[in-house]
């Protein structure tokens, strides 16, 4: 249970760092950052592998890069939806 909570906290931090790199604000606050961190870790692992330091099952650098990619794509989608409305 404790490792799951640590993983969620790491996912939140990764999501916040990814959104800070891209400069987009995530919808959903902390929950949005957690989702971005988890999906970013998945994207980063798929694209870049597991190089670099690891914390709570997350390869830090690929996860941050993946979160930045995810937040950037999410920002493009939301911008497109706002323009259509």
UniProtKB/Swiss-Prot annotation:
Predominant cellular place of this UniProt entry's protein: membrane
Q: Which residues form the signal peptide?
A: none
Q: Where in the cell is it found?
A: Cell membrane
Q: How does it sit in the membrane?
A: Multi-pass membrane protein
A cellular component term from Gene Ontology for this protein is: plasma membrane
Query: What are the transmembrane regions?
Result: 2-22, 28-48, 58-78
Q: Which InterPro entries match?
A: Transgly_assoc (IPR007341)
Query: Which superkingdom, per the lineage?
Result: Bacteria
The entry's keywords: Cell membrane, Membrane, Transmembrane, Transmembrane helix
Q: Which family does it belong to?
A: Belongs to the UPF0410 family.
Q: What name goes with this protein?
A: UPF0410 protein YdaS
